[in-house]
């Protein structure tokens, strides 16, 4: 038993009373999200009817989860906080640093050898401060959290953008940067702008080829990659009860791709069944005792337009399978229209690799349904046209799938079973290809499909689909294949149709534990060592405080054009090895961003040398000369993962300001936490006024205050000047972070 019984018992004992108190004070019906949020206020004396999308609120989450790539920087910051133990139950999960190459056994052995210094550091820090530690191979953070820690009505933060996966068990689970996680682990208040709430009413029931993944793929097309920003997506309606807990988790997981703060479902019998199957009967008993407050009030779901900021309806009975992409997860296309899209746009029609897994789709049910299709290859005398890669979500899933014949079904097709880890989904894929720059198509059951993300090739057209559809397209090897109507030719020359996928929601024989890989903290005063000459880890030095003056005559480091995700700002893949070494990882800063003035990546004007150079190299030179710089960008800057390195790297290299048309939620918070200025255009057309050789000043910082605009002054190379207003979302506390140099400096 790794979950925290004492904490859970106390939580449920107090939960009903807290919700009743909220209802009495607010004097109105409550959505599920509101019940959970208000029940987690840091100080009940602060209770009032907060304005959604406007008011900042202090919360007290129940727990923290961290993956190994982001945990390094989070724990380096925590070590500077002067605490002996974490204030809430916390865990570290080693899932990001394992590169997919030869297969699970070999890859885990390589990872342990390659990352020994980092793993030892994370294990020792975890032991020292009372943090649970999950070893490499134990599983993907979000699957392990779902199996062991998530609980209905709870609230958690995680240093990974797909933390909302726990919403599949009715939990408000929010992806954050490491500095936010440190707030929670030190027992401080954790600040969040009160989210708006988007209600999604589900009716009907899935059938045939349609899966829970298709719900969120369709919704991504409706909301786009930023339509859920600063909002919680709350699912309700009779259709929710037809979805398994892991299916719900899939939907919540990919809410990150529309920018949602989190997503969640109401507690129901499917969640109870999953909790019991994973050994948490007592959680079910406690949740059932307060089940009326683990869903929205009846009047809310009866009259949703009066209580949600937006209402979207999806009929599961009419839903088609979807394929989203390429290059963005909101390019949603139903399978009935996909072949036409492939031909019209000239996408590489041949599907070169199918990949099943990731935190989004690696549950027992996912593998069970995909395996039912794999078995048809033998049964119908077919062959598989494309290579298949499978990443189970956890050791528990892998061991159970092996016992129940699923692994054998995949391996019979020549599939490579990779480690229970993230692998290709985050760019940890040593792909073997004849030409790493060739145009090609892959289909995955992952969540993101940004350019270069999976394999580093900008010409890999990555499409996101359900595990079932990924498996079918792998068998066919053809993006234009529609398994709902098309047939394949078998070895006998017969035209055969794939039968609809089937599978069990949960294993009939129960879960196999396998080699779990959990290490409980032993509480001893473990010595933590970081070698001074380490290339993987580096102790942090506090950032300097603001000098009290306006920021004057800053050179433009880069004016980024188009999509600029955290992958563009701080690439993962081969750079993951430097996630604990701020100086080294800063070498990748903004190397993927497109320069608006020349259309190139990692090539910007260096005014100190009057030549072009790399982004990080140019910033380093400015820093060495004591010159701060500024970055300008377009919409939804910082979309994607929660990695705070995308904020810490610019701060480390003396970039003081990011001026964008809009920001992704997590990244904007990360910038604020690191003492940077995150500003937005009042008039987005002012973006076009900024020239390559401009010097930019920020005026008004002496009177920096909530709701008060600042002024940007452009000093053009020809001696002329222009100015325009910019806005911000800083409150008094966040302004204090800026003045102190970072949030950590205010502790």
Regions found by a protein language model. Give the residues of each.
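Flexible inter-domain linker/hinge segments
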Residues: 5-7, 16-21, 36-42, 46-47, ...
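Acidic, glycine-rich flexible loop/linker segments
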Residues: 488-505, 667-737, 744-746
């Amino acid at each position: 038993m790794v979950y925290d019984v004492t904490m859970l018992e106390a939580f449920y004992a107090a939960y009903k009373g807290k919700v009743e108190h909220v209802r009495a004070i607010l004097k109105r019906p409550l959505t599920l999200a509101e019940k959970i949020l208000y029940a987690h206020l840091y100080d009940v004396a602060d209770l009032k009817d907060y304005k959604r999308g406007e008011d900042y609120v202090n919360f007290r989450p129940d727990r923290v989860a961290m993956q190994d790539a982001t945990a390094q920087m989070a724990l380096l910051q925590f070590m500077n906080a002067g605490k002996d133990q974490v204030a809430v139950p916390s865990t570290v999960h080693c899932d990001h640093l394992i590169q997919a190459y030869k297969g699970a056994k070999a890859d885990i052995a390589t990872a342990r050898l390659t990352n020994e210094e980092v793993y030892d550091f994370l294990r020792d820090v975890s032991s020292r401060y009372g943090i649970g530690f999950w070893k490499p191979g134990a599983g993907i953070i979000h699957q392990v959290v779902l199996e062991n820690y998530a609980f209905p009505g709870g609230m958690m933060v995680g240093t990974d953008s797909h933390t909302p996966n726990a919403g599949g068990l009715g939990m408000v689970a929010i992806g954050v940067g490491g500095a936010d996680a440190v707030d929670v682990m030190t027992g401080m208040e954790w600040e969040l702008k009160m989210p708006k709430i988007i209600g999604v009413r589900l009716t009907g029931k899935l059938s045939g080829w349609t899966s829970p993944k298709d719900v969120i793929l369709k919704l991504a097309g409706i909301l786009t990659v930023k339509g859920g920003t600063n909002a919680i997506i709350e699912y309700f309606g009779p259709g929710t009860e037809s979805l398994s807990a892991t299916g719900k988790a899939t939907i919540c997981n990919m809410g990150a791709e529309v920018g949602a703060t989190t997503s969640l479902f109401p507690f129901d019998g499917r969640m109870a069944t999953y909790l019991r199957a994973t050994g948490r009967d007592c959680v079910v008993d406690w949740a059932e005792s307060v089940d009326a407050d683990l869903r929205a009030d009846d009047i809310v779901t009866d009259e949703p337009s009066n209580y949600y900021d937006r209402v979207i309806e999806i009929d599961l009975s009419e839903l088609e399978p979807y394929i989203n992409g390429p290059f963005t997860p909101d390019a949603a296309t139903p399978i009935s229209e996909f072949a036409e899209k492939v031909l019209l746009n000239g996408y590489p029609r041949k599907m070169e690799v199918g990949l099943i897994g990731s935190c989004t789709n690696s549950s027992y049910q996912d593998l069970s349904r995909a395996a039912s299709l794999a078995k048809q290859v033998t049964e119908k005398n077919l062959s598989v046209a494309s290579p298949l890669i499978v990443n189970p979500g956890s050791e528990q899933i892998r061991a159970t799938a092996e016992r129940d014949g699923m692994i054998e079904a995949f391996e019979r097709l020549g599939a490579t079973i990779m480690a229970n880890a993230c692998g290709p989904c985050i760019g940890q894929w040593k792909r073997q290809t004849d030409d790493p720059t060739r145009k090609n198509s892959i289909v995955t059951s992952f969540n993101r499909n940004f350019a270069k993300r999976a394999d580093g090739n900008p010409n890999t057209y990555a499409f996101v689909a359900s595990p079932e559809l990924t498996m079918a397209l792998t068998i066919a090897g053809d993006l234009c294949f529609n398994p709902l109507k098309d047939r394949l030719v078998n070895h006998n020359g017969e035209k055969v149709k794939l039968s609809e996928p089937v599978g069990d929601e949960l294993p009939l024989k129960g879960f196999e534990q396998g080699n779990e890989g959990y290490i409980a903290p032993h509480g001893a005063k473990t010595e933590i060592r970081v070698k001074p000459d380490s290339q993987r880890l580096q102790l942090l030095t506090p950032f300097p405080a603001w000098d009290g003056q306006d920021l004057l005559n800053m050179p433009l480091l880069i004016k980024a054009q188009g999509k600029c995700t955290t992958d563009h700002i701080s690439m993962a893949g081969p750079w993951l090895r430097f996630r604990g070494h701020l100086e080294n990882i800063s070498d990748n800063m903004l190397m993927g961003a497109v320069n608006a003035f020349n259309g190139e990546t990692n090539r910007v004007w260096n005014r100190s040398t009057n030549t072009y150079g790399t982004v990080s190299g140019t910033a380093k030179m400015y820093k060495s000369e004591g010159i701060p710089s500024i970055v300008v960008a377009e919409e939804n800057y910082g979309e994607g993962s929660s990695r705070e390195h995308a904020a810490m790297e610019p701060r480390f290299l003396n970039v003081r300001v990011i001026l964008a048309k809009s920001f992704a939620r997590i990244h904007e918070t990360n910038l604020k936490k690191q003492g940077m200025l995150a500003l937005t255009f009042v008039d987005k057309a002012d973006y076009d006024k900024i020239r390559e050789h401009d010097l930019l000043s920020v005026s008004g910082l002496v009177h920096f205050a909530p709701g008060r605009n600042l002024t940007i002054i452009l000093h053009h190379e020809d001696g002329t000047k222009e100015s325009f207003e910019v806005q911000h979302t800083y409150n008094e506390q966040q302004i204090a972070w800026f003045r102190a140099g970072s949030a950590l400096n205010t502790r």
